[in-house]
Amino acid sequence: IRVGAARALAQAGLGVAELDHIDLYSCFPAAVEMAADMIGLGHDDPRGLTLTGGLPYFGGPGNNYSMHAIAEVVGRCRSRPGSNGFVFANGGYLTKHSFGIYSTAPAQGWMRIDPAIDQIEIDAMTSPSFTEAPSGQGSIETFSVVHDRGLPAWAIVIGRLDDGRRFLSQMVDGLDALIDRPAIGRRIAVVAGHPVNRARWV
């Protein structure tokens, strides 16, 4: 997201501060927060992060939500000639990204940039190694508690072993401790399992 947004803004000759109308694809709050962080927008930016009210409230048939955001940003740019709009869309598991810059004032000297240049930077980024069969102690990176009939049933836990490897696991006991106080960074133990890895508090 960071690389793509920076490229789109650079090609338009604009900075984040020069954007007047902003819409970030809003399938889930995490998608909006991650995009804002990568683009350089505050979560409470006074310009707002949606032009429609957001996908959960505005809707949009099928995969068509961002078309409505584009239509809205075009209308706003036309009503304020010279203003600039930005629409970010994503798909997959936050793995496919689209960036659009809109204005009534065309960028001067615009030229296409080969996306392979940006792909080189993306390919050079480091990420933790992943293990499908974790064993040992580590810490929680993030989690989601699954509820059944209003009660916590189990949790998906993404963690990092002490050796740095990332893992995916399930937790079934001690779920209140995930909900009642901050859990990110807390210590857990994990054992490989079939069909799922199991995490527990230490």
Where are these regions (language model features)?
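Extended C-terminal subregions enriched in glycine
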Residues: 10-15, 20-24, 58-64
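Beta-strand segments within the central parallel beta-sheet cores of soluble alpha/beta enzyme folds
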Residues: 16-24, 45-53, 80-90
